[in-house]
Regions:
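Short alpha-helix boundary/capping and kink motifs at helix termini
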Residues: 2-62, 69-72
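Exposed, low-complexity/repetitive linear segments and helix-based recognition motifs
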Residues: 7, 98-100, 124
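Compositionally biased, low-complexity repeat tracts
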Residues: 17-19, 39, 85, 103, ...
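Exposed alpha-helical structural elements
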Residues: 31-35, 94, 120-121
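A short, basic-hydrophobic beta/loop patch
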Residues: 44-107
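Alpha-helical interaction elements
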Residues: 102-128
Length: 128
């Protein structure tokens, strides 16, 4: 079983896959702005998924980019997160990218990209 730890992360300590040179920077298009607007309105979200970057105090964001953007827009300083071990976190980030591509291909009607976050939440419930 993968050890998942509930933490609060400073928003300034988050790094994306693209910022590390491991992914593509995606533009903030109309669709993404719509998701962020909805999240800002809702105000309560599932925790993001992060992986610690060794000896740096920073975290790799593996799931939850839209939630982070909404939190920044709301001027929040921190966000609730689930910390995954590095190997699992990188695998989750890769899987999440594939699932987002599937969602995009089918007009975001399959909600495949939600699978990663739901899995992590279920894992924390099983540990309690």
């Amino acid at each position: 079983m993968i050890k998942i730890k509930k933490i609060k992360v400073d928003l300034t300590k988050l790094v994306t896959m693209a910022e590390m040179g491991l992914g593509v920077v995606r533009p903030l298009n109309k669709e993404k702005r719509g998701w962020i607007k909805k999240l800002k309105k809702d105000g309560v979200w599932d925790p993001i998924l992060v992986t610690p970057i060794r000896d740096s105090g920073y975290y790799l964001l593996t799931d939850g980019w839209h939630r982070v953007q909404a939190a920044k827009a709301l001027k929040r300083k921190t966000i609730n997160a689930l910390q995954l071990p590095a190997d699992a976190g990188l695998s989750m980030a890769k899987a999440n990218k594939i699932l987002r591509d599937i969602d995009r291909q089918y007009g975001f009607k399959l909600y495949c990209s939600d699978i990663i976050g739901h899995w992590a939440m279920m894992q924390t419930l099983l540990e309690e």
